[in-house]
């Protein structure tokens, strides 16, 4: 059942990435991150937001946008803005901000590789704040992060820490949790 949901989730990500790229298919190289990798990862961020429920008090008003922040050096560039332009999550527009330090108002925080040495500190500061934390740094979940993106022989994948998500007051869809590599392959997620 989880494999069927994963197939649907990956298909949704690839369709979103294809529309943004103007291509009928996306080849995700495994060697080094490239623009296509980040196009797919941007689509993952969008889909993560669709499968997370934030408490009402996380937003200033009922119509406030969902704010996706990138902390540190931004590996996405314009790809993130292009992917999210015009998209909605639970009826909310999506706003993108780039930050040098954590600031209030973020709902989803992508922590870039330039922040590697501060991961444990950052996740500790955000431990009980309703901010979905995502990074592609190895060991992010073990440092207290919620979703860790990685690329393996099967393409872009993710691990999730349901306890970290719950502790922050967010609710992750059971479907999202079931799609995570570490939930489908409990021996560690990465293959």
Regions found by a protein language model. Give the residues of each.
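Short hydrophobic alpha-helices and adjacent helix-cap/hinge residues
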Residues: 2-191
């Amino acid at each position: 059942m989880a494999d069927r949901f994963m197939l649907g989730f990956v298909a949704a990500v690839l369709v979103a990435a294809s529309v943004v790229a103007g291509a009928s298919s996306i080849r995700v190289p495994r060697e080094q991150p490239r623009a296509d990798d980040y196009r797919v990862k941007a689509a993952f961020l969008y889909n993560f937001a669709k499968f997370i429920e934030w408490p009402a008090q996380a937003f200033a008003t009922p119509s406030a946008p969902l704010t996706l922040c990138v902390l540190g050096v931004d590996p996405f560039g314009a790809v993130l803005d292009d992917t999210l332009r015009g998209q909605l999550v639970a009826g909310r527009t999506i706003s993108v901000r780039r930050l040098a330090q954590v600031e209030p108002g973020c709902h989803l925080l992508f922590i870039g590789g330039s922040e590697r040495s501060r991961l444990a500190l950052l996740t500790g500061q955000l431990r009980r704040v309703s901010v979905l934390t995502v990074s592609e740094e190895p060991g992010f979940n073990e440092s207290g992060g919620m979703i860790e993106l990685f690329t393996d022989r099967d393409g872009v994948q993710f691990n999730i820490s349901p306890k970290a998500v719950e502790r922050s007051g967010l609710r992750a869809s059971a479907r999202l949790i079931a799609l995570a590599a570490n939930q489908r392959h409990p021996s560690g997620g990465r293959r």
